[in-house]
């Protein structure tokens, strides 16, 4: 009886699960960052999404970054899954803050609320917005 080798995706998933299996500390150490993670689903029209995102949304957020108290922003586009398929997610924005208190203060600002309200103008596939704590 021959056994088939696990797929690359299964191996990557196992490696990630092993590497990430440590629970996050209850009390964050000094300097541990917090973030708002915005996960964008596939939009109905990617060209329209990209145009609005680059020309309107990102500049809108950037114009309020100081008010919001952002320390770092990373924008990621997902062209494919690891096995070459079209992913359910299209983009991700990782918006970092120096502490949980700074995050809570930032998301309460008029600038953050304006950027959040702007999502309806281009994120036609829907979004998921999460709060995350950096654990490494």
Where in this protein do the model-derived segments appear?
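Macromolecular interaction modules
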Residues: 4-7, 20-136
